[in-house]
């Protein structure tokens, strides 16, 4: 059989002919074939878990058919995500592995880092909730072991801790190619330590992690309660710190709140700088969605990004997942994206989504309270800015948050034409993309209406 990369490129070319362009761009363009397994399975990487599941459900059969047409052999695709995205999603043994690790510092760096190419400082969106953590991470990357050592980053799931750790690793390696950088989770550290003891390779294990320039260890809270692992990490920490090697640690909570963590480890974690990351505000959430859309070559209307940003304020992972879901839904039903479609796509994962039973009068009353406009003025012919602009906001929200048709909305605003409603919606949508003060006002009104 021909080279697997060439084969997969041919498969993708055939896919372009058989699926819509949005579907191809959303699901297939970023895939890559890695290896053959047992001569009957082709291993294909997808960019994330959602894409992997979608590909399995919708494109497995078509993939097999195309491969059979091209080669005469029927292969079953197995869609996986890269190991650096999810360690437990281990690729099979037949998958080409990175070069063997060497214990000599400065060699085989890439084989140990397992860094995600997408997680760099350039792709990190800075906001009020992560500004200090970003600055500290950049300082550490620019001057390892001279700025803050250790650097301890904590925060909830999906807020960017891992992104910053990978960014530090990339920056160090870019500016010092001979540096030995290792990134791993504390769970992996624990598993490797257990295996090393079982296989009588404790010395090899210690050499591996005590002869590095930068150690990036994620989710340190998982070693809590594991006495032997804590003992080993304590000595690893000491060895690196004494040699002025940089240590960066992440957790879902500060050291003092990690239960069953030994006091001697807790005190060492507090030697350097402790910084937290909090959930992103509305402006940051919109910026994250824009950057994600740009990175994925997706054309997402502003109203859709605003809708998603208003609905999901927990973490970045859920925010980006919601965007992918909306894109997928739009591709599946072959309809253009708008706020109504986004609401439909996300109704199963957002239990408190904007209620469609809301009335236009409810919206007019609340907008009027915020802008000191009387209810009757929304229906009057007044065109002064103090009335016209709030009226346009109310029209925009009526379009976003109710099922009312354009003529119906127009009639509720003094019998105005549906084109007036369209103009108001377009105007406010554009302003929301750039006007932070307006974003805050509309968000406040939206949240009140949701309640």
From Swiss-Prot:
What ranges does the record give for the region Domain III, AAA+ region, renumbered to this chain?
114-330
Q: What is this protein called?
A: Chromosomal replication initiator protein DnaA
The task this protein performs is described as: Plays an essential role in the initiation and regulation of chromosomal replication. ATP-DnaA binds to the origin of replication (oriC) to initiate formation of the DNA replication initiation complex once per cell cycle. Binds the DnaA box (a 9 base pair repeat at the origin) and separates the double-stranded (ds)DNA. Forms a right-handed helical filament on oriC DNA; dsDNA binds to the exterior of the filament while single-stranded (ss)DNA is stabiized in the filament's interior.
PROSITE patterns linked = DNAA
Cellular component, GO, one term: cytoplasm
| A GO term for molecular function | lipid binding
- Show the segment(s) annotated as Disordered: 88-108
Question: Which residue intervals make up region (Domain I, interacts with DnaA modulators)?
Answer: 1-93
Q: Which family does it belong to?
A: Belongs to the DnaA family.
Location (main, coarse): cytoplasm
Per UniProt, what is one Pfam family of this protein? Bac_DnaA
Intracellular or extracellular location(s): Cytoplasm
What segment(s) does the record annotate as region Domain IV, binds dsDNA?
A: 331-451
Q: Where is this region: Domain II?
A: 94-113
Record remark on domains: Domain I is involved in oligomerization and binding regulators, domain II is flexibile and of varying length in different bacteria, domain III forms the AAA+ region, while domain IV binds dsDNA.
Record the organism.
Answer: Shouchella clausii (strain KSM-K16) (Alkalihalobacillus clausii)
Q: Which InterPro entries match?
A: AAA+_ATPase (IPR003593), Chromosome_initiator_DnaA (IPR001957), Chromosome_initiator_DnaA-like (IPR020591), Chromosome_initiator_DnaA_CS (IPR018312), DnaA_C (IPR013159), DnaA_dom (IPR013317), DnaA_N_dom (IPR024633), DnaA_N_sf (IPR038454)
Oligomeric and partner information: Oligomerizes as a right-handed, spiral filament on DNA at oriC.
């Amino acid at each position: 059989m021909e080279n697997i990369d060439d084969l997969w490129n041919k498969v993708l070319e055939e896919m372009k002919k058989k699926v819509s362009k949005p579907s191809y761009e959303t699901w297939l363009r970023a895939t890559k074939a890695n290896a053959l397994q047992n001569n009957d399975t082709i291993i294909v990487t997808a960019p994330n878990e959602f894409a992997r599941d979608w590909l399995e459900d919708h494109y497995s059969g078509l993939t097999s058919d195309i491969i059979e047409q091209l080669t005469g052999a029927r292969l079953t695709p197995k869609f996986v995500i890269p190991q650096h995205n999810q360690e437990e999603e281990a690729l099979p043994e037949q998958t080409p592995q990175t070069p063997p690790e060497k214990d000599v510092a400065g060699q085989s760096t890439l084989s140990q880092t397992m860094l995600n190419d997408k997680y760099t400082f350039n792709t990190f969106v800075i906001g009020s909730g992560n500004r200090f953590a970003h600055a500290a991470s950049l300082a550490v990357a620019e001057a390892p072991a001279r700025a803050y050592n250790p650097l301890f980053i904590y925060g909830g799931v999906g807020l960017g801790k891992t992104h910053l750790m990978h960014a530090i690793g990339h920056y160090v390696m870019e500016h010092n190619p001979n540096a030995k950088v290792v990134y791993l989770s504390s769970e992996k550290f624990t598993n490797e330590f257990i295996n090393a003891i079982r296989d009588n390779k404790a010395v090899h294990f210690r050499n591996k992690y005590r002869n590095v320039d930068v150690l990036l260890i994620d989710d340190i809270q998982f070693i809590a309660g594991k006495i032997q692992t804590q003992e080993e990490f304590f000595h690893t920490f000491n060895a690196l710190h004494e040699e002025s090697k940089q240590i960066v640690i992440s957790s879902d909570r500060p050291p003092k709140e990690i239960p069953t963590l030994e006091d001697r480890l807790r005190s060492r974690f507090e030697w350097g700088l402790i910084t937290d990351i909090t959930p992103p505000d509305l402006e940051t959430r919109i910026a994250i969605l824009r950057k994600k859309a740009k990175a994925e070559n997706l054309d997402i209307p502003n109203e859709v990004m605003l809708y998603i940003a208003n609905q999901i304020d927990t973490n970045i992972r859920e925010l980006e997942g919601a965007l992918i879901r909306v894109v997928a839904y739009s591709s599946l039903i072959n309809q253009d994206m708008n706020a109504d479609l986004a609401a439909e796509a996300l109704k199963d994962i957002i239990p408190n989504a904007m209620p469609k039973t809301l009335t236009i009068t409810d919206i007019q009353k609340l907008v009027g309270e915020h802008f000191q406009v009387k209810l009757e003025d929304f229906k009057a012919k007044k065109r002064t800015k103090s009335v016209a602009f709030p009226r346009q906001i109310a029209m925009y929200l009526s379009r976003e948050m109710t099922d009312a048709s354009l003529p119906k909305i127009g009639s509720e605003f003094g019998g105005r034409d549906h084109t007036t409603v369209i103009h108001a919606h377009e105007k406010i949508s554009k302003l929301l993309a750039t006007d932070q003060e307006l974003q805050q006002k509309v968000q406040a009104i939206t949240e009140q209406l949701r309640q």
